[in-house]
């Protein structure tokens, strides 16, 4: 299978490096200064918090027209429109691996419904960018056990879905076919948007934990989002946010926000790109609620 990873930020760089080191035929699409850096140095991966840097010579390209069997898109939500324009008129399946709450319909309208698959990137693709060097976020036993979900928009288990899951598993990626991928993504957004926006408004996860009223308000927004969904939450464990007592959930959320998991996660990233992505996700959820 000839693969293209579209997006050379943290997620795309880490994902393509893993696939390349596993021996898969993969290229990484980049533009501008990032493209020039990758051509000179390859994907540069920092070794933990140290200064040692490992270079992975992933082939890089500037355009997506290369006869790829599968293009994996790893960009921010608000960057997807530009990606769709560049993929329209090409052939090959496209796996969208990013935050998305608008469903598969607008993606299919732009590039062809038969090409679209939905998913979400694995924990191994998380980290931070330090100049041109990617610092992978340390994984834990629990995060390594969380599978990377991939699914057909209509929930079917198709030959291409099974083939893609097998391909990623050969690279050591814990991929799994998810029959309710659209509901999975909407559930994730229902929780992530209020959490991320409240964390940024407070000045960080610990600052939010110190304000129980703000945590309670965030929980109310999460519950509103989940109630607006046309289906039950996926995974089903998110239903606990609708049923457990408010006081218990507020206490658990405050404890989580103070944990190293939250402090060292993307929640501490208040970059303009993160703010723009959360804003676009919020727009998608509002539009979905109006249609419903």
What is each residue range found by the language model?
Residues 182-226:
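Active-site-proximal catalytic alpha-helix in oxidoreductases
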Residues 3, 25-27, 94, 116, ...:
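Hydrophobic anchor at the start of a short beta-strand
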Residues 52-136:
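Rossmann-like NAD(P)(H) cofactor-binding subdomain of soluble oxidoreductases
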Residues 1-51:
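NAD(P)+-binding Rossmann beta1-loop-alpha1 motif at the extreme N-terminus of oxidoreductases
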